[in-house]
Amino acid sequence: MSHSLPRLAAPALLLVLAACAGSPQQGAFLSSYEGLAPRTDMVRAGALDRSDPAALAGVTSVRIEPTVFSPRAEAKAWMTPAEQTALLREVDAQLCFELSERFEIAGVNAPPQTPRVRAAVTEVIPTGRAGSAASAAAGFFIPGPIGVRVPGTLGGLGAEAEMLGPQGQQAAAIVWRRTATAIGTDNPSLSRIGDALQFVEPFADAAAAAMTPEDHTARTITAETDPCREFGARFRVEGFGARFITGLYVPEASAARPADTAPETVSAPQP
C-alpha cells in the first residue's frame, strides 16, 4: 500500500499545478490578439502565443522597450510606487537576460528597422505576508523540495509581450499567467510582490522562446560583454542562500539591481 502513495501523489500534484496555472486574459496591450493559440507544453502556467517564422527568420538584434502596466492592470492600484518600480524593473531584467542569449541587444540609438520587443504586466495578485512566514516555518520541518503554502498566501502574475517588425507588424506574441501553488516549489515571501517577482523569469523565458527563430544559435555571454549588466548578476548567490536559510524568497537578495526609475503607464502601440 505504501508503494502506491507516490504514484497517486504525482497525478494529484499535476492537477493542483494545472488548476493554479490559470487562464490568461487579454490585457488590451498587444497590437493584435489574432492567431494566438494555447501552449500545451506548460503545466504550471497558462499561455497563448503565436510566432511568424518568416518574420522571425532574419532577426539578429532587438530593441527592448521599458516594461509598462497594461491599461487594464487595475491590480496595480494596491501596489506602492516602489513595488511597481521593482516589478517592472525585474521584467526588464529577465527579458534582457533571456533575449540576449538569442539576439544582440540594441541600444536606444538602434536603427529604426530594428525589431522592437515590448511587454506589459497585466495582473498582479499579492502574496500574503503573514501566512508566508507560517509557510516558511512549516517548510523547515518538511524535508525535500516540495513545500506547502498556507491559504491566503498565493500570489500571481499576468503579463504579455510581443515583437514588432520594422513596419509595426507582429512577428511574435504571448499572453501568460501563473499563480502560486499550495503544494509545490514556489517559495513564500514577506514581500507582497514576492510571487510576482519569482514568476517573471518563467514568463520571460516563454516570451523569448516564442520570439526565437527555429534555427537560432545560442549566443555566448561573458561578464565583460553582458548587455544586461546594469541589472546586476544573472544568478544571485545571496538569493539562493537566503531561500536555503529562511525558506523565503527575499527580493533584496534575488531580484534585479534597483534603478532610480519611475513606473511607466502604457501608451498605444506605435507602428
Which residues make up each language-model segment?
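Short secondary-structure boundary motifs at beta->alpha junctions and helix caps
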Residues: P145-G158, L164-A210
